[in-house]
């Protein structure tokens, strides 16, 4: 079994890891490396152990211990656009130009308290970038906006609400915040990244479709269903995660998007966790030791 010390070490470095491959429903999920100019479609090694093994759970518990108190490092701010959007911002201890990572919360973060987008399942996607070892190697701004009406467009006259095509108002306002931060701080504009979980994952796909050639890379976890088919900004590196036991967002939504993106000429990375449900995917994805190194290796030309 992995030791506590080893779990902590793995959170800040790329481990030897293991390779995971699966084939389901006719979609090849094998993660063979396919070198390219940017090397973004070469699958990094995953964390040791199976998704539900004691080794993997130790890694998640180590992350929770390490990330305690990091919420307090986020500054509370608000943006006034078509409506008021609260957001949290972490500023790194550096004066040079550094990347910016934006995290879009899932439905559990809905509201206007400027807090829930940092708590519960959102701790992984917001705090991983703040871990001391990650800030030492990859200093960056971290933006966590909060919406009370979703990232994509919905028809709320229907029950349940129906997803609509087009640029989501929540996604658009969040990008206006990014544009403002680019003017206010020394942000490396070639290295702006977007990540999201569940409803936030749908927001990521919406941004890729409606703000092409803007992001250096994207990370999605069990992304919610939407009209965005995954082919937007097809040249942008994407690492997509999903659990095949997800009862909230069917795993077929990720499989279909990834298949469409590959057909359109993209080279996304797709990691599917066997036996993992909706809530379990985010912790596994954002504690993959190779994730920070992969993200920050991507940049726009």
Where are these regions (language model features)?
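A domain-start/cap signature at the N-terminus of enzymes
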Residues: 2, 8-19, 27-100, 202, ...
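Active-site machinery of serine-nucleophile hydrolases
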Residues: 109-171
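Gly/Ser-rich "nucleophile elbow"/oxyanion-hole loop immediately N-terminal to the catalytic nucleophile
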Residues: 156-197
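Short, proline-enriched alpha-helix->beta-strand connector loops that line the catalytic pocket
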Residues: 138, 233-238
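Primarily recognizes the serine-hydrolase "nucleophile elbow" in alpha/beta-hydrolase
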Residues: 190-233
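C-terminal catalytic histidine-bearing segment of alpha/beta-hydrolase fold enzymes
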Residues: 237, 241, 247-301
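The conserved beta1-alpha1 loop
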Residues: 104-105, 242
């Amino acid at each position: 079994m992995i030791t506590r010390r080893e779990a902590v070490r793995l959170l800040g470095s790329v481990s030897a890891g293991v390779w995971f491959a699966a084939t389901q429903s006719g979609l090849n999920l094998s993660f063979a490396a396919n070198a390219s100019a940017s090397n973004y479609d070469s699958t990094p090694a995953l964390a040791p152990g199976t998704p539900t093994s004691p080794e993997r759970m130790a890694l998640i518990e180590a992350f929770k211990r390490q990330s305690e108190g990091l919420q307090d490092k986020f500054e509370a701010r608000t943006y006034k656009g078509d409506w008021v959007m609260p957001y949290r911002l972490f500023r790194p201890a550096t004066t040079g130009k550094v990347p910016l990572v934006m995290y879009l919360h899932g439905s559990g973060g809905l509201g206007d308290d400027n807090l829930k987008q940092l708590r519960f399942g959102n701790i992984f996607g917001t705090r991983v970038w703040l871990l001391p070892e990650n800030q030492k190697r990859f200093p960056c701004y971290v933006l966590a906006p909060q919406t009370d009406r979703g990232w994509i467009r919905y028809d709320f006259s229907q029950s349940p609400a129906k997803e609509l095509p087009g640029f989501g108002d929540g996604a658009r306002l969040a990008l206006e915040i990014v544009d403002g931060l680019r003017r206010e701080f020394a942000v490396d504009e070639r290295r702006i990244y977007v990540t999201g979980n569940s409803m936030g994952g749908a927001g990521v796909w919406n941004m890729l479709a409606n703000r092409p050639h803007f992001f250096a890379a994207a990370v999605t976890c069990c992304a919610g269903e939407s009209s965005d088919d995954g082919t937007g900004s097809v040249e942008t590196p994407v690492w997509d995660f999903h659990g095949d036991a997800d009862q909230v967002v069917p795993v077929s939504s990720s499989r279909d998007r990834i298949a469409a993106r590959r057909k359109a000429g993209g080279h996304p990375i797709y990691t599917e966790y066997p036996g993992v449900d909706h809530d379990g995917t985010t912790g596994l994805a954002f504690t993959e030791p190779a994730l920070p190194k992969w993200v920050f290796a991507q940049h726009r030309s």
